[in-house]
Swiss-Prot record:
Sequence positions that bind [4Fe-4S] cluster: C145, C149, C152
Protein name from the UniProt record: Dual-specificity RNA methyltransferase RlmN
Listed InterPro entries: Aldolase_TIM (IPR013785), Methyltransferase_A (IPR040072), RlmN_N (IPR048641), RNA_MTrfase_RlmN (IPR027492), rRNA_lsu_MTrfase_RlmN/Cfr (IPR004383), rSAM (IPR007197)
Organism: Brucella canis (strain ATCC 23365 / NCTC 10854 / RM-666)
EC numbers on record: 2.1.1.192
Positions annotated as active site in the UniProt record: E125 (proton acceptor), C383 (s-methylcysteine intermediate)
Protein's cellular compartments: Cytoplasm
Pfam name, any one: Radical_SAM
Enzyme class: transferase
Catalyzed reactions per annotation: adenosine(2503) in 23S rRNA + 2 reduced [2Fe-2S]-[ferredoxin] + 2 S-adenosyl-L-methionine = 2-methyladenosine(2503) in 23S rRNA + 5'-deoxyadenosine + L-methionine + 2 oxidized [2Fe-2S]-[ferredoxin] + S-adenosyl-L-homocysteine; adenosine(37) in tRNA + 2 reduced [2Fe-2S]-[ferredoxin] + 2 S-adenosyl-L-methionine = 2-methyladenosine(37) in tRNA + 5'-deoxyadenosine + L-methionine + 2 oxidized [2Fe-2S]-[ferredoxin] + S-adenosyl-L-homocysteine
Length: 411
């Protein structure tokens, strides 16, 4: 049995018009700014330059260690300065439209972000996957996707826009709010707090969109998430998943340095061209070369290769042999993901016996190849089926959302 909380009311045309007007008057958010950007913003707002370094340190602590979302809660900052900050900036959380809790503990949030410029409000989902000893948050980087992977439900939704670094981080901050994962902070009304201990230990960029097609905003968000003076997530607990944007894979290794996951799904170019069409631009030889050259690879820092199991498509023993040959010499883990059907798809999940044979061969060749147990199916939060309908705001009703989320995630 799953639990669902509808946390908003239906939008009307008048409400949408108010959203549009508000977007033109929106104050910039301090969340998602680099220290350099925050310094420039504070100086422009009137903070004396000699105080800026100290003020950034204070703000960073309140935003990312204490998790406050109201300047009034920043108790070691003067009342006058708090008023000035509130006049010029915002640190508000996005609207939580809906929260769903699966019978297996998986949680899914539908977040609404305000419009950018003349655009409409957009909605995206984040999924929290609890496991023994860790909790993983699956984060989106775009609204929609451009990649049109044939087996993926998200690929049937056109790209609406990129998310900003603020919106990427807001998913993490709001999830921590609702899980009671900030110290000495009251949880929001209606939040259902799980057992004690740090709730979010890992994040994976495996939600909606291709993170490397939004490189600069994703980079900024992940560097803030891994900053030791704030959210302080180890880069070994942050995994970025890509379908194979080869030039940005090199940049990811050089400029971000987080764990890498590759949505592989096929070991022959002619098949991968169909399943993952970006392969036509960056074929397997180029992709695997970039993986081999990813900085710092070792048995402790492996690349995760994601492989969805499609019946009679990519699940033969010959495919397993080619997979082992393709990855030879790369420190790697191979996540085998049973396909989750969605309305309109022509693909089927491989038989369980065939998945196990495939896994046994890959394991015998020396590669860890766990078969991912689907999580959150009862709340539409399982592998490869995330799809927001936020680009189709109904005329007088709130947005409907149908979504599933990749459950394979990093260590």
């Amino acid at each position: 049995m799953s639990i669902s909380f509808d946390l908003t009311i239906d939008d009307t045309r008048d409400q949408l018009a108010r959203h549009a007007r508000a977007s033109l008057e929106a104050k910039p958010s301090l969340i998602g700014m680099s220290r350099e950007e925050m310094a420039a913003a504070l100086i422009a707002a009137g903070v004396p330059e000699r105080q800026v370094k100290m003020r950034i340190s204070q703000l960073w602590h309140w935003l990312y260690v204490r998790g406050v979302s109201d300047f009034a809660d920043m108790r070691n900052i003067s009342k006058d300065l708090r008023a000035m900050l509130a006049q010029h900036f915002t640190i508000a959380r996005p609207e939580v439209v809906e929260e769903q809790i699966s019978q297996d503990g998986t949680r899914k949030w539908l977040f609404r972000f305000p419009p950018r410029g003349a655009g409409r409000p957009v909605e995206i989902e984040s999924v929290y996957i609890p496991e023994e000893g860790r909790g993983t948050l699956c984060i989106s980087s775009q609204v929609g996707c451009t990649l049109t992977c044939s087996f993926c439900h998200t690929g049937t939704q056109k790209l609406v826009r990129n998310l900003t670094s603020e919106e990427i981080l807001a998913q993490l901050l709001t999830a921590r709010d609702r899980l009671g994962d900030f110290p000495d902070k009251d949880t929001p009304d209606g939040a259902m707090v799980p057992a004690e201990g740090r709730k979010i230990t890992n994040i994976v960029m495996m939600g909606m969109g291709e993170p490397l097609y939004n490189f600069e905003e994703v980079k900024k968000a992940l560097l803030i998430a891994s900053d030791g003076d704030g959210l302080s997530l180890s880069k070994r607990r942050i995994t970025l998943s890509t379908s194979g944007v080869v030039p940005e894979i090199y940049r990811t290794g050089d400029e971000i340095g987080v764990m890498l996951a590759i949505s592989l799904h096929a070991v022959r170019d002619e098949l991968r061209d169909i399943l993952v069409p970006i392969n036509k631009k960056y074929p397997l030889a180029e992709l695997i070369k970039a993986c081999r050259e990813y900085p710092g690879l070792s048995n402790a820092k492996r690349i995760t290769f994601e492989y969805v199991m499609l019946k009679d498509i990519n699940d033969s023993l010959d495919d397993a042999k080619l997979l082992v040959k393709l990855l030879q010499g790369i420190p790697a883990k191979i996540n085998l993901i049973p396909f989750n059907p969605w309305p309109g798809t022509n693909y089927q999940c491989s038989d369980w016996e065939q998945i196990e044979k495939f896994a046994d061969y890959v394991n015998a060749a020396g590669y860890a190849s766990p078969i991912r147990t689907p999580r959150g199916r009862d709340i539409l939060a399982a592998c490869g089926q995330l799809k927001s309908e936020s680009e189709r705001l109904r005329k007088s009703e709130r947005l409907a959302l149908e979504a599933m989320m990749i459950a394979g995630h990093g260590e």
